[in-house]
Amino acid sequence: XXFENFLNANXAYVNLD
């Protein structure tokens, strides 16, 4: 993906295209 975002609610790291 190109967009990177942090999910503070779950403290997880995800990559969004």
Curated annotation (Swiss-Prot):
Keywords: Lyase. It comes from Streptococcus thermophilus. It comes from the Bacteria. The keyword Disulfide bond does not apply. Its EC number is 4.2.1.1. The lineage of its organism: Bacteria, Bacillati, Bacillota, Bacilli, Lactobacillales. One of its GO terms (molecular function) is carbonate dehydratase activity. The keyword Iron does not apply. This is Putative carbonic anhydrase. Belongs to the beta-class carbonic anhydrase family. It catalyses: hydrogencarbonate + H(+) = CO2 + H2O.
